[in-house]
């Protein structure tokens, strides 16, 4: 009997979760029984992310051993991220202006959701300027950064440590072997944890559907449709077009990442697939030094789906209140989002926090966010999938840009996937 692939297992878990959540809609016992299962799965993933990032980066950087080369890669990566996320903001603004998802919506028919936790988080984040964000990339205590899961300081430390290992030559070989062994062991652990993924997805989706009110979705159905349609357009037209410029087929990337996309979509967490997409991009021909740097950094600076949604949601709320935003106001919104959407990936409910920090500066009532908070989970699932594709593509593009992409390895990996399909 043929073994069912992971993508199908996760998909079955997703469907069963929807069915169970729908049958027991409004029953608090669903959350009581299933939430712990979902939480355990998410905690297992979070447990392995930092060890994988550190070990992979140290090994990758030590193999390069050149600060000038790494600086060049870092500069190119940030430029690419800024260009793509700016395009995402423009696409979100255009979609909101063309399709007018907030026009004609009766605010009295909408349910308000408590967003106080997001407000509190925003107040904490807003104390940090863009300059402080860059200053905080350098950790004053690496163990503090490790305990809080602050990814940018961890990446910075790992790069510096990898350069140090390379600089001491023969003396550094035992250290390098230790981190190589750690990386391999952690990828093995990842594969074992992924066997639990269908159960984690079943539990998380079951809880979401059991709590989610259809009555809150109907008045906002146009927003949901516009968001999903725009996300699909961004994947196939924008990312697909960029991929083609570099000789990459976007459908090949989607085929490679099918397991990860279903998992990221179901859990609304791109962190759940970080170790797997690093591993797969390496198998697809990207060098470890580039995948281990570009993909984790992208989680802070290249959230394409999130930035697109933030632009679209901002205009939606303006339309909801009957505010007609001028071109100059929308350009101001674009410029503000270019800054506020960067460097706070570790913050819970990052898209909401960015919107809370942004709306007031361009004259849009922040209270409007309470109307869309109830359906945020459904929208979050879509933007998470886009984030995963965007960061995976970034690793391939940077590998090609640096002239380090292994075409033969990539073709061989694709052929292996087609044979096993």
From Swiss-Prot:
Annotated membrane topology: Multi-pass membrane protein
GO molecular function: symporter activity
Gene Ontology biological process terms in this record: dicarboxylic acid transport
Localization, UniProt: Cell membrane
PROSITE patterns: NA_DICARBOXYL_SYMP_1, NA_DICARBOXYL_SYMP_2
Bilayer-spanning residue ranges: 4-24, 44-64, 78-98, 149-169, 199-219, 223-243, 245-265, 307-327, 331-351, 352-372
One Pfam family, short name: SDF
Gene3D superfamilies the record matches: Sodium:dicarboxylate symporter
Gene Ontology CC annotation, any one: plasma membrane
Extracellular domain ranges by topology: 25-43, 99-148, 220-222, 266-306
Side of membrane Cytoplasmic, spans: 1-3, 65-77, 170-198, 244, 328-330, 373-421
Domain of life of the organism encoding this protein: Bacteria
Keyword entries, A-Z: Cell membrane, Membrane, Symport, Transmembrane, Transmembrane helix, Transport
Keyword Transport: yes
Subunit record text: Homotrimer.
Role this protein plays: This carrier protein is part of the Na(+)-dependent, binding-protein-independent glutamate-aspartate transport system.
Record-linked PANTHER family: PROTON/GLUTAMATE-ASPARTATE SYMPORTER, PROTON_GLUTAMATE-ASPARTATE SYMPORTER
Family indicated by similarity: Belongs to the dicarboxylate/amino acid:cation symporter (DAACS) (TC 2.A.23) family.
Identification of the protein by name: Proton/sodium-glutamate symport protein
Organism name: Bacillus caldotenax
């Amino acid at each position: 009997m043929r073994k069912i692939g992971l993508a199908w297992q996760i998909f079955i878990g997703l469907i069963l979760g929807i069915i169970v959540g729908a049958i027991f809609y409004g029953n608090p016992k669903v959350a009581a029984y299933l939430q712990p299962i979902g939480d355990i799965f998410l905690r297992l993933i979070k447990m392995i992310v930092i060890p994988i990032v550190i070990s992979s980066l140290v090994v990758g950087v030590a193999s390069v051993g050149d600060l000038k080369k790494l600086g060049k890669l870092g500069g190119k990566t940030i430029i690419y991220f800024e260009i793509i996320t700016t395009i995402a903001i423009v696409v979100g603004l255009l979609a909101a202006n063309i399709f007018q998802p907030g026009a004609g919506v009766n605010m009295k028919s909408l349910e308000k959701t408590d967003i106080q936790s997001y407000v509190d988080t925003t107040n904490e984040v807003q104390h940090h300027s863009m300059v402080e964000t860059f200053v905080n990339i350098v950790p004053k205590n690496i163990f503090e950064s490790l305990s809080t899961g602050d990814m940018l300081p961890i990446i910075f430390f790992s790069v510096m440590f990898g350069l140090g290992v390379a600089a001491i030559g023969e003396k550094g070989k035992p250290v390098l072997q230790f981190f190589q062994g750690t990386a391999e062991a952690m990828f093995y652990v990842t594969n074992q944890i992924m066997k639990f993924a269908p159960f984690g997805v079943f539990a998380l989706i079951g809880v979401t559907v059991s709590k989610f009110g259809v009555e809150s979705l109907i008045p906002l159905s146009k927003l949901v449709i516009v968001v999903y349609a725009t996300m699909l357009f961004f994947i196939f037209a924008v990312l697909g077009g960029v991929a083609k410029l570099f000789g990459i087929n976007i459908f090949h990337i989607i085929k490679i990442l099918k397991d990860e996309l279903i998992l990221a979509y179901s859990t609304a967490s791109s962190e759940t697939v970080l170790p797997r997409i690093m591993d797969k991009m390496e198998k697809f021909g990207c060098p470890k030094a580039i995948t281990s740097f570009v993909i984790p950094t992208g989680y802070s600076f290249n959230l394409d789906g999130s930035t697109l949604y933030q632009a679209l949601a901002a205009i939606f709320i303006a339309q909801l209140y009957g505010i007609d935003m001028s071109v100059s106001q929308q350009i101001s919104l674009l410029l503000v989002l270019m800054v506020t959407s960067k460097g706070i990936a570790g913050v819970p409910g990052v898209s909401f926090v960015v919107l809370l920090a942004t709306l007031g500066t361009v004259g849009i009532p922040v209270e409007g966010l309470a109307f869309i908070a109830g359906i945020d989970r459904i929208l979050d699932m879509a933007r998470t999938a886009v984030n995963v594709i965007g960061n995976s593509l970034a690793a391939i593009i940077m590998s090609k840009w640096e002239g380090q992409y292994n075409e033969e390895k990539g073709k061989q990996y694709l052929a292996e996937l087609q044979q096993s399909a």
